[in-house]
Amino acid sequence: KRQALLPYAKTRLDLNYIIGEMIAELACGHAYVNPGEIKGPERIKMGLLGAELNRDKSGFYRIEKILPGAIYSQKLRSPLTEPGLGVKEGDYITAVDGIPTTTVDNIYSLLIGKAGVLTELSINSTPSAKGARQVVVNPIDNEYPLYHYNWVQNNIKKVEEATNGRVGYVYIPDMGPDGLNEFARYFYPQLDKEALIIDDRANGGGNVSPMIIERLLRRPYRLTMSRTSTKVGTIPDATLVGPKVLLINKYSASDGDLFPWSFKANKIGKVIGTRTWGGIVGISGCLLYTSPSPRD
C-alpha cells in the first residue's frame, strides 16, 4: 500500500519517510532508517563561554554564573576557568576581539565561528570600558556537558548534605562506554558509604547493564584489615555492602530500561520513580549500497 507513494518521492528524505511509515506498522522499538545520501549544510559553530550572561543597562555583559568544569575531560573544559585568566562571576565582558559589546544587539553575534578559535575578551570588574583588561579564551561549541556535569555534582552535594556523608550517589547517563566510565568514576570512591543511590533517570541505553549488575551483586565472603589500620576491606574487592536504591523515570530507555528490571529481579534494592520507557529490543542491521541503514 505504500507503493502508491513512491512516484511522489523526489528526494532521499521523501523515501526515508515512506520507509519510516512501513517500519511504524511493525510497532517495534529500535526500528528506524538513517538518512543515507543527504548532503547537509556546513554548520558554523557558535563560540560559547561556559557561562550565563546578562546584559547590563550599560550595554556590557555581566557574568552571572561560570559553569565549573573538570580537568580530566576535554569536553568538560570550561573556557573562563582556565588557569591564569582570573575571570570571576560578577565581572563584565566589555568587548570581544576589540569590538565593544555596546555596538551589537547580542554578544553572541561576536562569537559566531569562534568555537575552538582563540578569542580576546575585555574584562572589567565594573560596567565600563575604562580600565578593562584583556584575556584570551578558547570558546567551546557545546555547553550541555557542563550543565549536565554540574547537575550531577549538585545531586552528589544534596545527598552528601542530607545524609551527613553516609550515603553515596552515582548517576549513569547511558549503558555505553560513557555510562560505564561514569559508573566506575563515582562508584569506586564511594565504597565506604553506608548506602548508595543509583540514578538511572534519562539513561540513553546501550548494552553494559549486565556488567554493572554483576558488580552490584557482589557479596563479601571474607574481610581484610591491615595491622596498623582500622579500615575494613572485602573479598572480593570493590564490594559495597550497604543497601541500594535505584531512581528511574519515563526516559530510562533501552538497556537503561532493562537495568531497573534486572535490579529488581536480582533483589538488589528498591526501584523508585515513574514507569520506564518500555522499549527493550536488541538491534542489528545491514548496510544498503545506497548508505541508509534500516535497523531491526
Give the label of every model feature segment:
Residues 3-62, 129-155:
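Extended, small/polar residue-biased N-terminal targeting/export presequences
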Residues 43-103, 177:
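PDZ/PDZ-like domain segments forming the peptide/carboxylate-binding groove
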